[in-house]
Amino acid sequence: MAIFSVYVVNKAGGLIYQWDSYSPRAEAEKTFSYPLDLLLKLHDERVLVAFGQRDGIRVGHAVLAINGMDVNGKYTADGKEVLEYLGNPANYPVSIRFGRPRLTSNEKLMLASMFHSLFAIGSQLSPEQGSSGIEMLETDTFKLHCFQTLTGIKFVVLADPRQAGIDSLLRKIYEIYSDFALKNPFYSLEMPIRCELFDQNLKLALEVAEKAGTFGPGS
């Protein structure tokens, strides 16, 4: 998908909603004999490369799969501990796929808080009063787009640099938030959004944005 992530950050800098479409991208896959010539360590419930960078395998990469079987955190899909499995000579030769790990929930919370602070700094540094703050950050692989409402809620979209119509999409997400979160009698302001209708309509809006590139009248 050309739209990678959607985040909603409350006025205090707390992450109250997040949606991701991307999967961890495999960087390298290699068959190893015993003993393993890489140093692996457990960090934040993930098995990461700590030493032995080689053949496209980099320090910080996570173990994504073993012998074609996906790894979830520190366990394989059939419930075996990764480090224990790789420490057993009887399991070799073994094929391991490495790649950049998906962000954990704690990391997303921390990054949302950091972006909230950067947004405030950007507003304060403006030579003019009433600055909108950060509206877009660009890298070589994605663009971060941000729309802040009058009440301080921030809607953040990470998308492919070539994706058009993100400004319209941000405002559409705001409409969906107003219609299906704020009008929900069971939803409390500033709290995490757990509304099925919000989820459904957000996904529909993202599909429309990717197909059409923008929103027209009546969308």
Curated annotation (Swiss-Prot):
UniProtKB keywords: Cell membrane, Endoplasmic reticulum, ER-Golgi transport, Golgi apparatus, Membrane, Postsynaptic cell membrane, Synapse, Transport
SMART domains: Sybindin (SM01399)
Pfam family, one: Sybindin
UniProt-annotated location(s): Postsynaptic cell membrane; Golgi apparatus membrane; Endoplasmic reticulum; Vesicle
Cellular component terms (Gene Ontology): cytoplasm; dendrite; endoplasmic reticulum; Golgi membrane; Golgi stack; plasma membrane; postsynaptic density membrane; presynaptic active zone
InterPro entries xrefs: Longin-like_dom_sf, TRAPPC
Expressed in which tissues: Widely expressed.
Cysteines engaged in disulfide bonds, as pairs: none
SUPFAM superfamilies registered for this protein in UniProt: SNARE-like
GO biological process: autophagy; COPII vesicle coating; dendrite development; endoplasmic reticulum to Golgi vesicle-mediated transport; vesicle coating; vesicle tethering; vesicle-mediated transport
Domain of life: Eukaryota
Role: Core component of the TRAPP complexes which has a function of guanine nucleotide exchange factor activity for Rab1 GTPase. Plays a role in vesicular transport from endoplasmic reticulum to Golgi and autophagy. May play a role in dendrite postsynaptic membrane trafficking.
Stated family: Belongs to the TRAPP small subunits family. TRAPPC4 subfamily.
Oligomeric and partner information: Component of the multisubunit TRAPP (transport protein particle) complex, which includes at least TRAPPC2, TRAPPC2L, TRAPPC3, TRAPPC3L, TRAPPC4, TRAPPC5, TRAPPC8, TRAPPC9, TRAPPC10, TRAPPC11 and TRAPPC12. Interacts with SDC2.
UniProt xrefs under PANTHER family: TRAFFICKING PROTEIN PARTICLE COMPLEX SUBUNIT, TRAFFICKING PROTEIN PARTICLE COMPLEX SUBUNIT 4
Designated name of the protein: Trafficking protein particle complex subunit 4
Protein source organism: Mus musculus (Mouse)
Lineage: Eukaryota, Metazoa, Chordata, Craniata, Vertebrata
Gene that encodes the chain: Trappc4
